[in-house]
Amino acid sequence: MTENKSFKESHPLDDFISDKELSNTTIQKEKLTIEQQKQVDTISKQINPLDNEGLLAFGSDLQKQMSQFSHQMLDEVQSKDVGPIGDTLSDLMSKLKSVNPNELNTDKPSMLKRIFSRAKSSINEIFSRMQSVSAQVDRITIQLQKHQTHLTRDIELLDTLYDKNKQYFDDLSLHIIAAQQKKLQLENEKLPQLQQQAQQSTNQMDIQQVADMQQFIDRLDKRIYDLQLSRQIALQTAPQIRMIQNVNQALAEKIQSSILTSIPLWKNQMAIALTLMRQRNAVAAQRAVTDTTNDLLTANAEMLKQNAIETATENERGIVDLDTLKRTQRNIIETIEETLIIQQHGREERQLAEKELQQLEQDLKSHLVNIKGPNKQS
């Protein structure tokens, strides 16, 4: 491969990638440096008129190198599957999302039970799960770092391939210019000489030399076209290399962002969430204790008030209530009255019985007198 510097500060391939207009005639002879023009002249001398075998070999080494380069590019693309990198990043995002700080909200309707009993996701469970996920994230981070190292190496390799492609492009351009220069020389100098010689000569071989030269110029033109096709391949390969580099660079940046930003931020936010949750539970526990204390004080005050009122009321009462005395006196009076009535009734009954007994006694006496009288007369 011919070593030469770029034709200009801004390389044609870079212009092509930047969407600047570029064609096979972009690099003209007048844009060549003196050194490059010397290279073109040297290459042009390699083309010997009517040397068809030499013409066939002209630039073939460059085309073979381009073919090898294309195979190298194909192997690079086939061997570097970015799928596992995407899977690793997806796995990382899945792990980061598996622990949700919102799950740390353990508020319940009750008071002390809400604070001290087991909630749907206790802090210990969340913390344990976070530690497990953190360990998995650390392992994924190691994998991502390896991927990033490989991507960085691939980017450097692609830079080397890009530089090689630029060199192929430059060498092909020099060969194309040299061939075009030789073609113009043959068309403007050699062919007219042969044509003039054939016109002035009656030798049939002179006419054949004109035909052979014309065919050689046609083959040279075809060879220029083949080299231009190879040059076009180099031209199209440049943005392909850059696209692969851009994808690798984007993945490397994504990995770096995940390692240096996303993962530390996730760990910080989880630590903050756990700290805030502990603070919230501490405040809630303190609030519950305070509320319970206030409730107890209020209940005790109400009980004390009720006891004081009842005690004072009882102290102001006599040993026996007035109503009880009235009711008792009324019962005694009623008992006495009923007793007197019963006694009066008994007295009356006894008097009546006494009268009846006297009558009975009188009747008995009369009956006995009557019985004794007849007995005496007998």
Curated annotation (Swiss-Prot):
Pfam families the UniProt entry points to: TelA
InterPro entries tied to this protein: Toxic_anion-R_TelA
Extra remark: Disruption of this gene leads to an increase in hla (alpha-hemolysin) transcription and proteases production.
Sequence similarity: Belongs to the TelA family.
Protein's name according to its UniProt entry: TelA-like protein SAOUHSC_01408
Organism, scientific name: Staphylococcus aureus (strain NCTC 8325 / PS 47)
